[in-house]
């Protein structure tokens, strides 16, 4: 086994990873204490109640302040929960809101299509599966919740891409590249852009075994009340059942479902 050498005197410093984890735990503890204290507290009270050195507490507060998770009252010097915490919570609530609104429409789509229904959101340069309603068929192909999907090579991923402005779309593709997963993955830029343009016109996109061999998927974008893409809804099934002759009828069904969810989220005019 290769020996790992660390600089400094033996036993003087903890491993970097351990120190980082400890700092994170202490930062979370500070935020939790502020929440229980009604949103604000003095540095001395935080230090006392969390059994932390005053200097350490102040240093952690400054780190949290840089991330906008806390801010300091210039008059009293007390520390308050900041806007960054609200933004994180709002993102969670927003995703949960999409799912709660989408629930009845997902069930209707599952019953009408006979296929498994999925809801995914974009997380950076990936799509993440956050909701699923399995079909009743004995033969079904389902990815577990939390699965990460490539944006360019999955139905949900392409549905999250096609509404984007060209500049943002190109930026994402250049960052992620066009990895090939199956023989039918779209791996050249002109073909992918043409596919996304067609999806934009139709209001839905089709994944023809582009991510998993034997699995087809049809997806459409979901918009919020201001017209921003917040999620994608899709149906997925074995290519032996979700065949090409069903793509148009099922695509329109998925598109109409996405529009109904968008309307329920407050969208007035559909793209």
Curated annotation (Swiss-Prot):
Keyword tags: DNA-binding, Repressor, Transcription, Transcription regulation
Result for mutant: residue 236 to A/M: Slightly reduced repressor activity. Loss of glyoxylate-triggered dissociation from DNA
A Pfam family that the UniProt record links to this protein: HTH_IclR
Chain residues forming the annotated DNA-binding region: 43-62
GO biological process, one term: negative regulation of DNA-templated transcription
Effect of residue 141 to A: No effect on repressor activity. Loss of glyoxylate-triggered dissociation from DNA
UniProt xrefs under InterPro entries: GAF-like_dom_sf, HTH_MetabolicPath_Reg, Tscrpt_reg_IclR_C, Tscrpt_reg_IclR_N, WH-like_DNA-bd_sf, WH_DNA-bd_sf
Superkingdom of origin organism: Bacteria
IclR-ED domain mapped to chain residues: 98-267
Residue ranges occupied by any HTH iclR-type domain in the UniProt entry: 21-83
Database matches in SUPFAM superfamilies: GAF domain-like, Winged helix' DNA-binding domain
GO molecular function, one term: DNA binding
GO cellular component term, pick one: cytosol
Residues that, per the record, bind glyoxylate: 154-156, 207, 217, 234-236
Function: Negative regulator of allantoin and glyoxylate utilization operons. Binds to the gcl promoter and to the allS-allA intergenic region. Binding to DNA is abolished by glyoxylate.
Assembly and oligomerization: Homotetramer and homodimer. Homotetramer in its active, DNA-bound form. Homodimer in its inactive form.
Protein name, UniProt field: HTH-type transcriptional repressor AllR
Name of the gene encoding the protein in the UniProt record: allR
């Amino acid at each position: 086994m290769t020996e790992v050498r660390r600089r400094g005197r033996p036993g003087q410093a903890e491993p970097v990873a351990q120190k980082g984890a400890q700092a994170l735990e202490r930062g979370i503890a500070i935020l939790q204490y502020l929440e229980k204290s009604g949103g604000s507290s003095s540095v001395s009270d935080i230090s006392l109640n969390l059994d932390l050195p005053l200097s350490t507490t102040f240093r952690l507060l400054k780190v949290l302040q840089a991330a906008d998770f806390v801010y300091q009252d210039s008059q009293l010097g007390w520390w308050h929960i900041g806007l960054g915490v609200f933004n994180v919570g709002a993102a969670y609530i927003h995703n949960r809101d999409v799912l709660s609104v989408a629930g009845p429409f997902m069930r209707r789509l599952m019953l009408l299509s006979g296929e498994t229904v999925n809801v995914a959101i974009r997380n950076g340069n990936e799509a993440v599966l956050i909701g699923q309603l399995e079909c009743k068929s004995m033969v079904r192909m389902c990815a577990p919740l939390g699965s990460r999907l490539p944006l360019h090579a999955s139905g949900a991923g392409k549905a999250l891409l096609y509404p984007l402005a060209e500049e943002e779309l190109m930026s994402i593709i250049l960052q992620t590249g066009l990895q090939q997963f199956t023989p039918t993955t779209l791996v050249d830029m002109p073909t992918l852009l043409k596919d996304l343009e067609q999806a934009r016109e139709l209001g839905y996109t089709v994944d023809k075994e582009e991510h998993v061999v034997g699995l087809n998927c049809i997806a459409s974008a979901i918009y919020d009340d201001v017209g921003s893409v917040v999620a994608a809804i899709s149906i997925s099934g074995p290519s032996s059942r979700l065949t090409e002759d069903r793509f148009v009828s099922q695509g329109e069904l998925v598109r109409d479902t996405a529009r109904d969810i968008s309307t329920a989220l407050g969208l007035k005019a559909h793209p």
